[in-house]
């Protein structure tokens, strides 16, 4: 039976995507609330924070002295030690370190320098597959939803610039397969993916910050619908964290800086004929 968090959920602040300041952060949650959750629910919440560990692992593999994002589940010292163990051919218990990260680090260390493998894509594939097997219906659905909308947008961009679509799709879901193989205008997905038409409209927005805002609004509304009947559960707490991180990101990214960032991404897309990790 799942745990109920009546007092905790009742005390969580109301959030809006338009909030311009926060008195609470995802880092605060980790230090103040995380340990009050059940062991099984902490594992679900760990999936949220693993996104920061993913970025940290990539940084440390390239530079062991790199500054990491402290919002992750693991310290720089822990990650460096795990990388060292795997570099020497050792093994790490899945109870101690997620198996997908061990797999990724091993694959990274064994990849020839001349390889054209995009490490960010490989890591994203492993992460999504790992998260979608978590056993929680809402959390698994969230990761699949996010994977699908990211891939659909990447497919639109690839088709627009006449790039190979299949090589830019991340993951192995039915939607991924349709995007890789279908030549139909809608990839055969307009009746399969509820938000497909919304994504078509969003992809046509030329003002890049507005487009990203619309995407976050789409994600926000999806969460609201998905947890409508989950009142005091870990699902509502997980959604709270997702919303909190969204607002944090927008507060730290003002409109002018946002336009510069996204225009540089588009420019790199045109110049490199590759889809960088930031665009996914």
Name these PLM-found stretches.
Residues 1-280:
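Extended alpha-helical surfaces
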């Amino acid at each position: 039976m799942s745990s109920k968090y009546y007092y905790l959920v009742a005390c969580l602040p109301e959030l809006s995507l338009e909030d311009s300041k926060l008195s609470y952060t995802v880092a605060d949650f980790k230090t103040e609330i995380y340990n009050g959750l059940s062991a099984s629910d902490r594992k679900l919440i760990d999936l949220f924070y693993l996104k920061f560990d993913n970025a940290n692992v990539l940084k440390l593999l390239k530079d062991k002295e790199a500054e990491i994002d402290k919002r992750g589940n693991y310290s720089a010292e822990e990650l460096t030690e795990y990388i060292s163990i795997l570099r020497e051919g050792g093994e790490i218990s899945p109870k101690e370190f997620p198996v997908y990260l061990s797999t990724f680090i091993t694959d990274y260390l064994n990849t020839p320098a001349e390889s054209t493998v995009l490490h960010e894509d490989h890591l994203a594939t492993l992460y999504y597959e790992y998260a979608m097997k978590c056993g929680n219906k809402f959390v698994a659905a969230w990761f699949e939803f996010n994977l699908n909308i990211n891939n659909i947008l990447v497919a639109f961009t690839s088709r627009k610039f006449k790039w190979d679509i299949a090589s830019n799709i991340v993951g192995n879901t039915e939607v991924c397969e349709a995007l890789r193989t279908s030549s139909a205008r809608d990839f055969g997905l307009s009746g399969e993916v509820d938000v497909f038409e919304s994504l078509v409209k969003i992809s046509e927005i030329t003002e890049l910050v507005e487009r990203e805002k619309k995407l976050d609004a789409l994600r926000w509304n999806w969460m609201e619908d998905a947890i409508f009947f989950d009142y005091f559960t870990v699902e509502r707490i997980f959604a709270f964290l997702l919303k909190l991180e969204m607002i944090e990101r927008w507060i730290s990214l003002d409109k002018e800086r946002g336009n510069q960032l996204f225009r540089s991404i588009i420019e790199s897309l045109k110049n490199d004929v590759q889809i960088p990790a930031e665009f996914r």
